[in-house]
């Protein structure tokens, strides 16, 4: 959460650097979210040189602090009054194409004899990131130290101020606050409840300031800062998977990672506002997306945490089982108990439709189910790959898990069938072992293999399921598929059932 907040703060820092150069306010930001920004700057004398001057300073600072891990590209187009008022599509397309060109040569102005190799002043490496050099073994680099302080601050504060200081006048006033030093300017995180600091900031005057998760000064931004807490500390992922849901109710202690984002949002911005296009519509849509992912998402997570039969009350301070790793712009990454993540994906899709009330604006997702001991970064990467698989489906609005992609219109039905299967196992109508064996037989590659497996499956049901009604229901679910996609969906249902049950 904290490293991604750092990236978000750096995006804002870049944005405000241009505004500060031209003496502009936050009103000149058309949008600034999801790692990108669109600004309205004046076409005055020397404006190109001023843009390049700011870019050189910011890019040099980023390269010094983060090497090539974090940087940015920029471009601009000129608009007359009519083009600006109507926010013409051809200008948006031109700007996008110019940005794509810049991506292919983003370090071309920074390449010199020291770009590829530079002798370090020290030989010790940061204990946290393993890439930046430090003075002594066991120390953290400046960047990792900032991330650690951000983490401590986020755990203790839900509402805060983020001040951007280009003049340096707040170094003494805010010397005890968390500072992200960009060398050419400083960003400070401030406790909103510190009345004394608040008064000093207002009295001194400030360049730019943002209020996080409440309304106070400057722009209001919503950041989904939600993690499971116990005794004031963030629960480890092992505890999230093992202690927050009952094993009797939800089976294996697996961790789930959910990654989702809005389908075709770029196309919606470019072409979906074609009738009476305007900057205000563009800005409104951008802010509505940010509000959903930064504000409403927290309440969705809290709702699912309360609804699940869980141990969340006794094992957390804030009755929440989900760790929001990132949420902003039009996408999210959330970590939690696997069974909770399965339900959360359904609820986010449902809530997003209610929020937009537009069947043409959808969301897609990818889910990873993994052991809590596996590195989280690998799980997030897999969830991202699953999301990419969902994005390849015609019309999208899909979710991928367990190597299969399902349309989200069908996903709720899948979870309903899982609950039915779970009941059959919990009430001992069928053993978990027999159910697992049937699932293994059904895990086929084509419809012909499925048809060949039906006689054996019917025999297994006859031998192992004594209740005639339940046997008929299982026959109906298992032996009536007409396409391989339906078989794939059935196997996903059975795998999820196995995961969420225990052998008696």
Positions of predicted regions on the chain:
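Charged, helix-rich terminal subdomains or tails
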Residues: 1-504
